[in-house]
Amino acid sequence: MQVRTPAIICAMRAHGEHGAIVRALTPDHGLLAGYVRGGRSRRLRPVLVAGNLVEAEFRARTAEQLPGLTVELSHSRAGLLAEPLAAAAIDWLSSLTAASLAEGQPHARLYEALDAVLAAIEYAPSARGWAAAAVRYELMLMADLGYALDLSACAATGARDDLAYVSPKSGGAVSRAAGEPYAARLLPLPAFLVDPSADSDWSDIVDGMRLTGHFLARDILVDRRADALDARQRLVDRIGRLA
């Protein structure tokens, strides 16, 4: 195996005395893991920050072997670690990606979407310009893994207008008229998840994160809830304070 590709750093963990195992999302090969010799050195630690864009080369003699990985920094987002809200968002989105995707499965549109959300975070660290996109990324990831929510029509009546809720069991949208008697048992559906042109305020973002969080915990992160969802809760708490 020899793959040279752009990649987004998603996770790093120490391995051995000085090395690191890095997981990175690539446009054509999906999530790949590799061993970086000296990955915890002063030179490489700033390169292997989650969210950074690198030129990566994976090399392995057999398909079963963990590849060796060398990286060259293409674009650094490490400076955003000084912005608590932006850092929390990058931590969560990269953790979600690393924890959810199987290695070696192509997810080209997820790569493009993650890169776009990270760029939006970089240019608007206050979250006004990227919070809705982060929720949409969560929905896209769920859909790519076979857990798409059906937000196109009311599951009860077939109506396509005034969709206001989502069933926490089926993941189907519910219209306001059909859902109001059961509102306490349903999840609010913010308009920006139905109509991409709709405006969103902080309460809408919180509702969107509550919606995706329910299904991520139930369907995607079942075996990793304690670790991966801690990063998400830090982001939700920070955004909740803005609402």
UniProtKB/Swiss-Prot annotation:
Gene3D superfamilies tied to this protein = Nucleic acid-binding proteins, Recombination protein O, C-terminal domain
**Highest taxon in the source lineage:** Bacteria
The answer on whether this UniProt entry bears the keyword DNA repair reads yes
BP terms from Gene Ontology:
DNA recombination; double-strand break repair
Q: Which GO terms describe its cellular component?
A: bacterial nucleoid
Listed A to Z, the keywords are: DNA damage, DNA recombination, DNA repair
> Could you tell me which PANTHER family the record lists for this protein?
DNA REPAIR PROTEIN RECO
Family the UniProt entry places it in: Belongs to the RecO family.
Q: What is this protein's function?
A: Involved in DNA repair and RecF pathway recombination.
| The protein's name | DNA repair protein RecO
Q: Origin organism of this chain?
A: Rhizorhabdus wittichii (strain DSM 6014 / CCUG 31198 / JCM 15750 / NBRC 105917 / EY 4224 / RW1) (Sphingomonas wittichii)
- Gene (UniProt): recO
